[in-house]
A protein has these predicted regions:
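N-terminal intrinsically disordered, cationic/polar leader segments
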Residues: 1-195
Length: 195
């Protein structure tokens, strides 16, 4: 089964192409024009073991908001497409990632219901030129368009870079586990028969 998607989105604010292979080995080619965000997407793909290409051009001269949020939308759509009917997937997963003083937990249910709940207090407004509140905006857009329920919670932390990076790694690892095929799962992993 080929669990791959390629999604393009072009608006007056952004032009984004995402290529996603759920059964990859963490090979990433990321270029969004937002260096810290590139670093986070690379961490997501590598720790999720997804082969991930993200090429985005946005109105970063305004700020990075449109680029980050729209990338979340397109990456979410790519996951939704690559998962297909979701037959045989594990569906539920969680992971806790430690990074020095920081501990962040993520949990997911690939439920067909797109929503995110993030408790990710970051002590500074910026990491370099990156507006730290955009991390949560990314997760909201991603969860909505991937049609999954996502929880991201900071359990400990002090360094803004560590908190955001641990969150992206935790979500990547959680998505890897939830998307994995389990040979014991017969059909759609739901008592309703669909997700």
């Amino acid at each position: 089964m080929d669990r791959y998607a390629e999604v393009t989105r072009k608006t007056g604010e952004t032009d984004i192409v995402v290529k996603l292979d759920l059964d990859g080995c963490g090979v990433c080619d990321i270029s969004t024009g937002v260096p810290f965000f590139d670093h986070m997407l690379n961490a997501f793909g590598r720790h999720g073991l997804f082969d991930l290409t993200v090429h985005a051009v946005g109105d970063v001269e305004v700020d990075a908001h449109h680029t980050v949020e729209d990338t979340g939308i397109v990456l979410g759509e790519a996951f939704c497409q690559a998962l297909g009917d979701k037959a045989g997937i594990t569906r539920f997963a969680d992971a806790a990632i430690a990074m020095d003083e920081t501990l962040v937990m993520a949990a997911v249910d690939i439920s067909g219901r797109g929503q995110a709940y993030c408790e990710l207090p970051v002590p500074t407004e910026r990491v370099g030129s990156f507006d730290t509140e955009l991390a949560v905006e990314f997760f909201y857009a991603f969860a909505r368009d991937a049609k999954l329920t996502l929880h991201v919670r900071e359990l400990a932390g002090g360094n803004s870079h560590h908190i955001i990076e641990a969150a992206f790694k935790a979500v990547g690892r959680t998505m890897r586990r939830a998307c994995e095929l389990d040979p014991r799962v017969q059909g759609i992993p739901s008592t309703k028969g669909l997700l």
